[in-house]
Amino acid sequence: MMLDLVKYPVIRTEKTTRLVENNQLSFDVDVRITKPQIRKIIEEFFNVKVLAVNTHRPPRKTNRLGSKPSYKRVIVTVDSDVTLLK
């Protein structure tokens, strides 16, 4: 199932709490998933219209040779008349 590639929502930082006010949600997803797949998963699971999908891979921790983060951080912008967190 495609939803298994979404690891968890990110709501633990100050920036992500500010993003929620702008109708943006942050998720950590598998590195193999693409932007169109992310858009499809979010639209089907939450029944919202996704306006934009931005992705980036966070920098790896120092002193860990040979390892990369096994996740990609995604910021999804949804339509303004929808609230996901009630």
Curated annotation (Swiss-Prot):
The keyword Ribosomal protein applies. Pfam families: Ribosomal_L23. One of its GO terms (molecular function) is structural constituent of ribosome. It is found in: Plastid, Chloroplast. Its main location: plastid. InterPro entries: Nucleotide-bd_a/b_plait_sf, Ribosomal_uL23-like, Ribosomal_uL23/eL15/eS24_sf. Keywords: Chloroplast, Plastid, Ribonucleoprotein, Ribosomal protein, RNA-binding, rRNA-binding. GO terms for cellular component: chloroplast; ribonucleoprotein complex; ribosome. The keyword Glycoprotein does not apply. Belongs to the universal ribosomal protein uL23 family. Part of the 50S ribosomal subunit. Binds to 23S rRNA. HAMAP family: Ribosomal_uL23_B. This is Large ribosomal subunit protein uL23c. It comes from Chlorella vulgaris (Green alga). The gene is rpl23.
